[in-house]
UniProtKB/Swiss-Prot annotation:
Membrane topology (UniProt): Multi-pass membrane protein
Transmembrane regions: 4-22, 44-63
Pfam families in UniProt: MMgT
Any one cellular-component term (Gene Ontology): early endosome
Subunit structure, as described in the record: Component of the ER membrane protein complex (EMC).
Cellular compartment(s): Endoplasmic reticulum membrane; Golgi apparatus membrane; Early endosome membrane
Record protein name field: ER membrane protein complex subunit 5
Gene designation: mmgt1
Spans within the Cytoplasmic topological domain: 1-3, 64-130
């Protein structure tokens, strides 16, 4: 859990960033009124923007916690080889293998099934087993 100090730093940084944005918008509207549209932002607004951005990023880095290693071996060393690529949600038991490798004793005895021509692919696969 992040300490309240770093959350306060992020809050102050965001507040300063919002203040810099408001100051830049106010300066731009002032420049339009005085018809000096080609002027750049004053250095204090630019510095406040950059400093508040750095403070906010620094606080967020401390709030985020520990970073993970980029090396995958540190995370994979706790897993066995069997569980490495094991995805049980992709298991499918209702597939065409039951129909392709059915023995003649298991053929359905319905008149509809006998009226259909036999599957040549299934017969070729069964011939290889005999």
């Amino acid at each position: 859990m992040a300490s309240s100090f770093w959350k306060g730093v992020v809050g102050i940084g965001l507040f300063a960033l919002a203040h810099a944005a408001f100051s830049a918008a106010q300066h731009r509207s002032y420049m339009r009124l005085t018809e000096k549209e080609n002027e750049t932002l004053p250095i204090d607004i630019v510095l406040q923007t950059l400093l508040s951005f750095v403070i906010t990023c620094y606080g967020i880095v401390h709030i985020s916690g520990e970073f993970k290693d980029m090396d995958a071996s540190s995370e994979l060393k706790n897993k066995t080889f069997d569980t490495l690529r094991n995805h049980p949600s992709f298991y499918l038991f209702n597939h065409r293998g039951r129909v392709l490798f059915r023995t003649p004793e298991q053929e359905p005895s319905t008149p509809n099934a006998q009226a259909l021509p036999s599957n040549p692919l299934r017969l070729r696969k069964l011939e290889n087993f005999h």
